[in-house]
Amino acid sequence: MVAAHAAHSQSSAEWIACLDKRPLERSSEDVDIIFTRLKGVKAFEKFHPNLLRQICLCGYYENLEKGITLFRQGDIGTNWYAVLAGSLDVKVSETSSHQDAVTICTLGIGTAFGESILDNTPRHATIVTRESSELLRIEQEDFKALWEKYRQYMAGLLAPPYGVMETGSNNDRIPDKENTPLIEPHVPLRPAHTITKVPSEKILRAGKILRIAILSRAPHMIRDRKYHLKTYRQCCVGTELVDWMIQQTSCVHSRTQAVGMWQVLLEDGVLNHVDQERHFQDKYLFYRFLDDEREDAPLPTEEEKKECDEELQDTMLLLSQMGPDAHMRMILRKPPGQRTVDDLEIIYDELLHIKALSHLSTTVKRELAGVLIFESHAKGGTVLFNQGEEGTSWYIILKGSVNVVIYGKGVVCTLHEGDDFGKLALVNDAPRAASIVLREDNCHFLRVDKEDFNRILRDVEANTVRLKEHDQDVLVLEKVPAGNRAANQGNSQPQQKYTVMSGTPEKILEHFLETIRLEPSLNEATDSVLNDFVMMHCVFMPNTQLCPALVAHYHAQPSQGTEQERMDYALNNKRRVIRLVLQWAAMYGDLLQEDDVAMAFLEEFYVSVSDDARMMAAFKEQLPELEKIVKQISEDAKAPQKKHKVLLQQFNTGDERAQKRQPIRGSDEVLFKVYCIDHTYTTIRVPVAASVKEVISAVADKLGSGEGLIIVKMNSGGEKVVLKSNDVSVFTTLTINGRLFACPREQFDSLTPLPEQEGPTTGTVGTFELMSSKDLAYQMTTYDWELFNCVHELELIYHTFGRHNFKKTTANLDLFLRRFNEIQFWVVTEVCLCSQLSKRVQLLKKFIKIAAHCKEYKNLNSFFAIVMGLSNVAVSRLALTWEKLPSKFKKFYAEFESLMDPSRNHRAYRLTAAKLEPPLIPFMPLLIKDMTFTHEGNKTFIDNLVNFEKMRMIANTARTVRYYRSQPFNPDAAQANKNHQDVRSYVRQLNVIDNQRTLSQMSHRLEPRRP
């Protein structure tokens, strides 16, 4: 889950340390920690808790580099594996020689493989890590023991034993494709096809509840209706159903959302269109509940009405969780020609988060949105295609799983949600290398047909312009329709524009300078295009290259044309350079003060423009703006108070005397304690962005000797990491209770945590139970907003590509991410330090109330941190405490948990955030994850050219931060006027235990595990 990413390395290191122990040495707390991590992994989501706990006892952790072969085809297996991170290629050879092996698919996160160890059959394929990967490994003896003990749980979870399929053996043959219910590739899907043949119990119950609620509260909605001289019995109208649902619950925010919720019932046949159409519409169309299909449909009893009142909100919550997926399926089931612009945008947004498509350009993804087809199959065992057939389609799994089967070898692997297969068929004409068989009922796929995909690629290539020098590409442009309406006004021909796909840094800069439009009416459009370059240039063209290039472009003189033409060109060229410099300086702001090259360039550039302005009146508009920026940055840099000192405590709590927190800059100095092996310490004073090498030098000066010193960061659980000499800004990357140690390398193993790192021994419930939940949420939001506002957009870029590559600090981002962990552990700490059961119940209520108020204030970061704290295993296992929580609060918590649902790449959260207007504090770990996803899924350089499409995607994500902050956070007047100093101080100085093992032990002491 994303939160594990947010907690940086501590929580992950914790569970890995537990797995590294020998099974006999693992305590119940170790198992709890491993269990918490594994239950969020896709491969284990359907495993029974008892089985998963046994896996926690016997599993091992493996971290493998790219290119490692786990086993070869024909080997006798000794281990079963599950993929926790990364991906692996499955290679098969007809001759059993690895030289001619063909990659038939890729195993992604959540995939499990290796069941052949149950009967010692040879491995059917070679498995090679595609990238750095994390695996869970279970040895053969342990896996067989699990199989014997939990066969009833595992039988439906592991790949079915198809056995060896020898050629000519009738018994071993895969079911014939003609005998399986399969939608033919080129037969258009009709929306009338139902997705499930039998409605699920949950959906049946939901339909009954909604029907009873309507009959109880608005009985006029269900009645006989006449239309075109025909009578339709006991029907509702689509628009009325949407109106009614919006009125019933606060969890429905739009008509589109309500449509999706009714679509859930329609897909399962619990609600039906009178003409059997299968997509629900917010129109004057007639729909009938399943119960009303009967002539003698009963009216609800008083007992049923009472049950309905109790269950209605839970039903609404269930449908609101299922609605987005149903709405997406509804769109995908429309024939491509019937999809609206809004439909295409929804599909495109979904495609952005599918790893299998991450390497494709924006244009290709948008084109795919128009041709993707939804395909579903009700029965496990259905053959999607057979080995040896012509490949005509590429599939992406939306729901369910499939087995990859090869004749003579059986099941070689299983693919799950998010994995793809059949892609080779789109790029060559080779026959299918394997058969694909559904391993469970009700599987959903996205399908791309070869003809459509090849057409898209042909169109893209036809619209691609390649500029060459010395027979080498130096700039690749793509022709796309102009996005703004102004470009098309008064012109019968649709306007075209060119976007940069890739190029050398110099040619990319040259292109942007040449295409800057100087007309005032086009300022906004020009700024938007330039923004990608000025935000991302640090990745491929640092200021040491950019500044000289800008000077050269500014002074460039054309060699051809009349004197007037040359003068006009030179003038406009200079104005374009000034325009880019203004936006560049505005983006970087006071970060430029830390860059000597940039400061020298700005001063030199200002002098050049000032000289030219005396002779050219056209510069009169731009000069004052440039002068203002240069003076502001120069004066700030020279101000004596500029270098404010940052104390150790400030990293956690901020300066209580200051009215507002100020951003930390790399040149700011920090007073920091570095500890020795005997827990004595020396205080050093270095810049925040100092490298580890500089930290060692400062420590050596204090200690009198630096011979063989290393710098180690250690968390409260004793996890130690030796820092590399080129690591920078290490002070803010520590965990909440982490500390820095300095010692000779030979003393590394003897380092132990400080007693103070253990955290508090008594809770603060006595203090904050007297504070209003709304006051606490308000002050938390005020502080979080200050932290969030201090984060510069470029820190996101430095964090994504590695700050050591830029020698820049990400201190403000680090502290904001640490705040998430601090609030999360604050919740767990307070609950685990509360020994009285009734007080713990009150604590749960308090935290749920605070979370609700944070959500009202649009502080999604703290909202998620609190909810994740409540879902921490040390809290969630306290069954006696949760049993006594009133049902109203349980419902609130269930609704909050539903927003944390990580499925479909956190779609529940994304939909919620998309409905909110700024100001907004986002769930920052997910934004970081999105940028990392784009970075890792796309190369920075392609054929020695900068992949600018990747730069554009990352810049687009980073820009959401600017959007969230585009409106100021206006404090609640009623809250701001209160005497809030105590609450303000409390939320800024949280004291927590961040050792999961300690928290689990405390939890077990509060409520020992039931026998």
UniProtKB/Swiss-Prot annotation:
Q: In which tissues is it expressed?
A: Expressed in cerebellum, pituitary, adrenal gland and liver.
All copies of domain DEP, residue ranges: 216-291
Keywords, alphabetical: cAMP, cAMP-binding, Cytoplasm, Exocytosis, Guanine-nucleotide releasing factor, Membrane, Nucleotide-binding, Repeat
Q: Can you name one GO molecular function term for this protein?
A: small GTPase binding
Chief site of localization: cytoplasm
Outcome following mutation: Y569A = 2-fold reduction in maximal activity
The free-text function statement in the UniProt record for this protein reads: Guanine nucleotide exchange factor (GEF) for RAP1A, RAP1B and RAP2A small GTPases that is activated by binding cAMP. Seems not to activate RAB3A. Involved in cAMP-dependent, PKA-independent exocytosis through interaction with RIMS2.
Q: What is this protein called?
A: Rap guanine nucleotide exchange factor 4
Lineage summary: Eukaryota, Metazoa, Chordata, Craniata, Vertebrata
Q: Which gene does this sequence derive from?
A: Rapgef4
